[in-house]
């Protein structure tokens, strides 16, 4: 199961209802953070997400509302006795930011922090997923990120149940290619796996104007998370500041052929999101506006009967 939790959905200034930007992506065995604005670890506590389970942090750009939660996050990990390494990815300047963080306070860490400077292309390559990136169009260098599962066999649930398996951890093991014992019998993965299916794809724009690089990166994604700092009619202001309106974000979603669009990074000047949502849905109907602590499950879009 894959879940996306919106820890913070405000733009440059937080409000009573919206924290600075951060998004948690939960996949089996790992949690990724995309951006880490001020107050992120408190939002994680409210969402029931442990910082100790975060394996990777992906930073889109170095504006304060996207990075100022990192020092506290690292310190809390140290206080709690973390030993597992943490990987941080970001644009040029991310190394200097990390060095500054380590100098500005008292840190006693028993874990390694691996910092990776990213300019685009493949960021992480694992057996079952990859993370890619592309430069977007903001007032400073900004990276859009895309998480994508690699193709894997469909899990034949009904066949597994017929073999005596109950829904639970055994299903996950078999889907990952691990044999499972049921009574005195060992069930092999190939007994309950079908033909390969497309993996889930999730794309996050960071702060950006509508641009071809994000459209290309997000092509065919199950979910596009796109900034919507300004409402429709504010295109000139959005262009000046390197941001997008709700309608522009919807046009990106339509051009990329994504399945669902969720808008985030909302200006505090807008108290009601209905106007933003209406403008976006006129262009791309499958649109929602994120709220803090909102969680959505993301599944692969596959109409095959054995999926």
Swiss-Prot record:
Binds 2 Zn(2+) ions. GO terms for molecular function: 3'-tRNA processing endoribonuclease activity; zinc ion binding. Transmembrane segments: none annotated. It catalyses: Endonucleolytic cleavage of RNA, removing extra 3' nucleotides from tRNA precursor, generating 3' termini of tRNAs. A 3'-hydroxy group is left at the tRNA terminus and a 5'-phosphoryl group is left at the trailer molecule. Keywords: Endonuclease, Hydrolase, Metal-binding, Nuclease, tRNA processing, Zinc. Zn(2+) 2 binds at residues 65-66, 207, 265. It comes from the Archaea. It holds the Pfam family Lactamase_B_2. Zn(2+) 1 binds at residues 61, 63, 138, 207. Signal peptide: none annotated. Its EC number is 3.1.26.11. The keyword Metal-binding applies. It is an enzyme of class 3 (hydrolase). The keyword Magnesium does not apply. Its cofactor is Zn(2+). The active site is at residue 65. Homodimer. Zinc phosphodiesterase, which displays some tRNA 3'-processing endonuclease activity. Probably involved in tRNA maturation, by removing a 3'-trailer from precursor tRNA. PANTHER family: ZINC PHOSPHODIESTERASE ELAC PROTEIN 1. Belongs to the RNase Z family. This is Ribonuclease Z. It comes from Methanothermobacter thermautotrophicus (strain ATCC 29096 / DSM 1053 / JCM 10044 / NBRC 100330 / Delta H) (Methanobacterium thermoautotrophicum). The gene is rnz.
């Amino acid at each position: 199961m894959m879940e996306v939790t919106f820890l913070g959905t405000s733009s440059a200034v937080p409000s009573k209802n919206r924290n600075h930007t951060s998004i948690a992506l939960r996949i089996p065995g790992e949690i990724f953070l995309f951006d880490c604005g001020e107050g992120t670890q408190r939002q994680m506590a409210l969402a029931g997400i442990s910082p100790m389970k975060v394996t990777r942090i992906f930073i889109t750009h170095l504006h304060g509302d996207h990075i100022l939660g990192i020092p506290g996050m690292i310190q809390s990990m140290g206080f709690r006795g973390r030993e597992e390494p943490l990987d941080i990815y970001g644009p040029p300047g991310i190394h200097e930011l990390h060095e500054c963080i380590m100098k500005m306070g008292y840190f006693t860490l028993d874990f390694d922090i691996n910092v990776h400077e990213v300019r685009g292309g493949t960021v992480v390559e694992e057996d079952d997923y990859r993370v890619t990136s592309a430069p977007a169009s903001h007032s400073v260098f900004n990276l859009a990120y895309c998480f994508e599962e690699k193709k894997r066999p469909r899990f034949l649930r009904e066949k597994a149940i017929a073999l005596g398996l109950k829904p639970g951890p055994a299903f996950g093991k078999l889907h990952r290619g691990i044999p499972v014992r049921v009574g005195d019998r060992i069930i092999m993965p190939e007994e309950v796996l079908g033909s390969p299916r497309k993996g889930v794809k999730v794309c996050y724009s960071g702060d950006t104007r509508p641009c071809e690089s994000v459209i290309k990166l997000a092509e065919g994604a199950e979910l596009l998370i796109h900034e919507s700092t300004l409402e429709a009619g504010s295109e000139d202001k959005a262009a000046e500041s390197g941001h997008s309106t709700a309608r522009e974000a919807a046009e990106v979603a339509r051009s990329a052929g994504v399945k669902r669009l969720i808008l985030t990074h909302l200006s505090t000047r807008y108290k009601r999101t209905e106007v933003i949502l209406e403008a976006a849905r006129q262009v791309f109907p499958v649109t929602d506006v994120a709220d803090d602590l909102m969680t959505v499950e993301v599944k692969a879009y596959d109409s095959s009967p054995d999926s």
